[in-house]
């Protein structure tokens, strides 16, 4: 069966945590445009869905998310959980509570619920040995999740995300997006992974990778995500002449 044949069948139900964030919302919106996949969102509170969304939403406390996953039995969990330094009150422990402990806990709960595959949204520069707090936390999360034992683990490391947020754009981030087109061409090739990337491309990549079944651990930089996003579009867009 080809990927296009697969897309013509019933949508694959993919679980998602982090639906209120930029990537999570784009995953819901983009998946709703085709019949390749359907998002089953799990959140702590009700949320307003993007216009035209076709998805299921479960509202439950985080300690019950594993039970939801066990009931849904998706082939893949997409984890886009994350907070900001500002929302965390510029407190390291508060930041770790969401970006590290909650991420690892839900990943473990998914594995315990027999969800075989995980797509994790991390960040460019993630490194457990980094002197930078943010990069170090992301690297530690990647290391912990890698040890859980998923059949397939996809780790996405996007650079600065471009896309509409819900009134939560930090000043430095806004400036970065404005000046990125001018600065990025001047950066050495080794910093290409830090370049900005459209949130839609990351969401498309996450959806496409969530449908893959080959076992293993795979880390995706901006270029790899763009390729995966292209594969998703090829999967869902009608063939020329259809």
Q: How would you describe each model-predicted region?
A:
Residues 1-9:
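A short, basic/flexible loop-to-alpha-helix module at the beginning of a structural domain
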Residues 22, 89-140, 147, 151-154:
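Conserved Rossmann-fold NAD(P)-dependent oxidoreductase catalytic core, especially the SDR/UDP-sugar
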Residues 26, 30, 109, 144:
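Rossmann-fold NAD(P)-dependent oxidoreductase module
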Residues 34, 128-236:
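Oxidoreductase cofactor-interface core, primarily capturing Rossmann-like NAD(P)-dependent enzymes
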Residues 9-34:
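N-terminal Rossmann NAD(P)H-binding glycine-rich loop of SDR-like oxidoreductase domains
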Residues 42-46, 61:
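N-terminal Rossmann-fold cofactor-binding loop
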Residues 17, 42, 80-81, 118-124, ...:
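SDR active-site strand-loop-helix element
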Residues 14, 55-105, 109-112:
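NAD(P)H-binding glycine-rich loop region in Rossmannoid oxidoreductase-like domains
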């Amino acid at each position: 069966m080809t990927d296009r044949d697969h897309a013509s069948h019933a949508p694959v139900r993919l679980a998602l945590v982090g639906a209120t964030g930029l990537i999570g919302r784009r995953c819901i919106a983009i998946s709703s445009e085709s019949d390749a996949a359907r998002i089953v969102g799990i959140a702590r509170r009700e949320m307003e869905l993007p216009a035209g969304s076709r998805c299921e939403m479960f509202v439950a406390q985080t300690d019950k998310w594993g039970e939801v996953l066990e009931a849904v039995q998706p082939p893949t969990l997409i984890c886009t959980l994350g907070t900001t330094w500002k929302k965390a009150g510029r407190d390291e422990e508060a930041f770790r509570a969401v970006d590290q402990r909650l991420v690892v806990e839900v990943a473990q709960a998914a594995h315990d619920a027999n969800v075989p595959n995980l797509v994790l949204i991390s960040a460019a520069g993630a490194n457990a040995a980094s002197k930078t707090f943010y990069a170090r936390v992301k690297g530690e999360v990647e290391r912990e999740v890698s040890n859980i034992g998923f059949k397939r683990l996809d780790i996405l490391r996007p650079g600065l995300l471009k896309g509409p947020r819900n009134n939560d754009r930090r000043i430095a981030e806004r400036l970065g997006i404005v000046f990125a087109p001018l600065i990025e061409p001047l950066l050495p090739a080794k910093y290409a992974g830090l370049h900005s990337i459209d949130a839609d491309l990351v969401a498309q990549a996450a959806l496409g990778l969530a449908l893959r079944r080959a076992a293993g651990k795979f880390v995706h930089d901006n270029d790899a995500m763009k390729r995966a996003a292209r594969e998703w579009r090829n999967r869902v867009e009608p063939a020329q002449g259809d």
